[in-house]
Amino acid sequence: MISSVAPPPEKMLFQLSLRRRGISDRGVLQAMESVPRDRFVDAVHRDSAWRDTALPIACGQTISQPFVVAYMTEQLHLQPGHRVLEIGTGSGYHAAVLSRLVRDVVSVERFKTLADRARARLKELNYANVEVVLGDGFALPEGQGTFDRILVTAAMAELPQPLLDLLDPDGILIAPIGPGNGRQTLIRVQRKDDGFLRKPLVDVRFVPALPGIAREL
């Protein structure tokens, strides 16, 4: 695994910022420190890669603010044997963080350009337990099975039932729910024997999840 090349002061400030904002899970903090965020952004933004801010990537998308990545990851309550589905690969950064904490990650991206770039980047950095799939988050490819955890990284007006059905018993899903052009609520959904238990977490702002596959972008 390639380690970060961030100067030590930047890395220390990065970790301190996460701790000050309430991230306390040691595994999550170690994963956030070990994944080189500067390798997942365009060269023009690399000087800002270790700042706690979202940054633009291709296809009108963004790489999420590090605190949001850490918070969502912490709320998943991950275990080493877990199998995780991510809807919205983007740059591949969040998938890389997840991969340090679980057995396998399947990440679905609707933009071919982003999927191809993320797949190549993750391979180059030796994140071998991440599979990037070009697909539609609203109509997922068949044959992937079910998952211990599901992470949605784009805003949905509501959760599609087929997505919820992919959760294993006691599985957890984290997703931003609300309008694509405003603030959303990050929710935590846990599958129980008698249905799905939903809990609102915090207000967030994500780009909207769009149906279909953008093979030309």
Swiss-Prot record:
GO terms for biological process: methylation; protein modification process; protein repair. One of its GO terms (cellular component) is cytoplasm. Its main location: cytoplasm. It catalyses: [protein]-L-isoaspartate + S-adenosyl-L-methionine = [protein]-L-isoaspartate alpha-methyl ester + S-adenosyl-L-homocysteine. SUPFAM superfamilies: S-adenosyl-L-methionine-dependent methyltransferases (SSF53335). It is found in: Cytoplasm. The active site is at S64. Its EC number is 2.1.1.77. InterPro entries: PCMT, SAM-dependent_MTases_sf. It comes from the Bacteria. GO terms for molecular function: protein-L-isoaspartate (D-aspartate) O-methyltransferase activity. Keywords: Cytoplasm, Methyltransferase, S-adenosyl-L-methionine, Transferase. Catalyzes the methyl esterification of L-isoaspartyl residues in peptides and proteins that result from spontaneous decomposition of normal L-aspartyl and L-asparaginyl residues. It plays a role in the repair and/or degradation of damaged proteins. Belongs to the methyltransferase superfamily. L-isoaspartyl/D-aspartyl protein methyltransferase family. This is Protein-L-isoaspartate O-methyltransferase 2. It comes from Rhodopseudomonas palustris (strain HaA2).
